[in-house]
Design a protein with these regions (language model features):
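Histidine-centered catalytic micro-motifs
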Residues: 47-57, 216-221, 252-255
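N-terminal secretory signal peptides
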Residues: 1-3
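Active-site gating/metal-coordination segments in enzymes
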Residues: 29-31, 118, 123-233
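Alpha-helical scaffold segments that flank or form the walls of functional sites
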Residues: 62-134, 141-151
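H/E-rich (His + Asp/Glu) clusters that bind or coordinate divalent metals
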Residues: 27-30, 258-404
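C-terminal segment of N-terminal export signals and the immediately downstream linker at the start
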Residues: 21-50
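N-terminal export signals
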Residues: 6-27
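Active-site neighborhood of phospho(di)ester-bond hydrolases with catalytic His/Asp-centered motifs
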Residues: 48-50, 122, 161-162, 187, ...
Length: 404
């Protein structure tokens, strides 16, 4: 194994020689061996990926919407760059038929996985104001439940995760309706959807979720994928206590690994790392068996230094972590820096080249394998345990009730 000191001392020589220090010159572990290691102990049919976005541009009357600011390259260049990155990561080649092309690529990538389990497909409701009125001018994108349910029919590996904004006048009725259609969870991104999880307006929705066994998958921490400049505090994980106290099972997406939020337990309301606030909730015994952390994005370059090692070290909480990919995010190459992960001691140098190939060939597979070959505090590549990828039925009780 190459040590960090050897790497740094050789960097100058390699740079002068015009070589790239990407690990390509070292044979390392083959992708096949990495997959074999990743699958050890995994029940292929119990595998679960709880975080896959359904996106599009409304082609084919899907009802999907994208705010014009996301596609206006001249007036909103940063949003345009972000949007193009998602398109490229999704493997879309037909820009005249984006919605169907996106789902065709996702289906092929899911079905190419060595696992034979379930991937939740997520709808995404429009922004509504506190009066219950839709606000399309504030909606960055939306994916109707009807389109999501139609997409689920494309593969037996898909299962439905609906999205119902709690401020809607018909929120309770809509939640019952999606539960009747087989939804196993509800997706919220409070920062982008303008939802305050602590608002009394959410209580009717919480009652229905608890009654129907609909798990709430809610973003935690700051949001960077969807522009949300003025509403970041809505992602404060402490605001999800209202859902927990109402009896809802809650999965906090990304384990609130990005950004800072107000410490609502502190009289001075000091800004604190959102991940630390989430971990405080995980350590609260009253939420054991009801609160879970989802691990998508915890290895991205802008949060891996604290979230990755922090979660790997808390082996006492691993049974309360669940796997999610946040697809198509794993396909955006700059977001996952394998050299950075090696520098942090989270992967072995000899695994780096094989991981890079897996991400290029199938970002979903690369994401799964990376999480399974991570190095723990002792330096051994033990990865997140199989329980994270094959969670117990109590996390998604509605999924457990669905016919095999």
């Amino acid at each position: 194994m190459i040590t960090r000191r050897q790497f740094l001392s050789g960097a100058c020589v390699s740079a002068c020689a015009g070589l790239q220090l990407t690990g390509e010159a070292h044979a390392g572990t083959s992708p096949e061996d990495l997959v074999t290691r990743a699958m050890a102990g995994i029940d292929p049919h119990a595998y679960l990926d709880v975080h896959n976005h359904v996106v599009g541009m409304g082609h084919g009357d899907t009802g999907v919407t994208v705010h014009p600011h996301m596609t206006a390259g001249l007036s909103h260049p940063l949003n345009w760059i972000r949007f193009r990155a998602y398109i490229r990561a999704s493997g879309i080649t037909d820009m005249d038929n984006v919605d169907a092309n996106y789902m065709a690529v996702l289906k092929s990538r899911v079905e190419a996985m060595p696992t034979r389990g379930t991937s939740l497909l997520m709808a995404f409701d429009r922004v509504h104001d506190e009066a219950g009125k839709p606000r399309p001018e504030h909606t960055v994108f939306s994916v109707p439940n009807d389109h999501m349910f139609n997409a689920v029919k494309l593969s037996e590996r898909f299962a439905p995760c609906a999205s119902v904004h709690p401020y809607r006048h018909d929120a309770a009725e809509a939640l019952h309706a999606v539960a009747d259609r087989g939804a196993v969870a509800i997706k919220w991104l409070p920062n982008a959807m303008h939802i305050d999880p602590a608002s009394p307006l959410c209580l009717p929705s919480y009652r229905v979720m608890a009654e129907r066994g609909l798990t709430l998958i809610s973003h935690g921490g700051e949001e960077s994928a969807v522009p949300s400049p003025d509403t970041q505090e809505l992602g404060n994980p402490l605001r999800l206590r209202a859902a927990l106290d109402a009896g809802v099972t809650v999965v906090v997406a990304h384990s609130a690994s990005h950004g800072h939020s107000l410490d609502l337990d502190d009289p001075k309301r000091r800004r604190t790392r959102a991940f630390d606030l989430f971990m405080r909730m995980m350590d609260d015994p009253q939420y054991d068996g009801q609160l879970y952390g989802e691990i998508s994005a915890v290895l991205l370059f802008n949060r891996v230094s604290h979230a990755g090692p922090g979660l790997m070290a808390r082996t006492d909480l691993h049974h309360r972590l669940v796997n999610g990919s946040d697809y198509p995010i794993p396909g955006i190459n700059p977001l996952i820096n394998l050299t950075q992960l090696w520098g942090l001691g989270l992967i072995r140098w000899e695994d780096k080249r094989g991981l890079s190939r897996l991400f290029r060939e199938n970002p979903l597979l690369g994401d799964f394998v990376l999480k399974r070959v991570l190095c723990g505090p002792d330096g051994e590549p033990t990865g997140f345990p199989p329980s994270v990828f094959c969670p117990s039925n109590e996390v998604f009780p509605s999924l457990a009730q669905q016919p095999a």
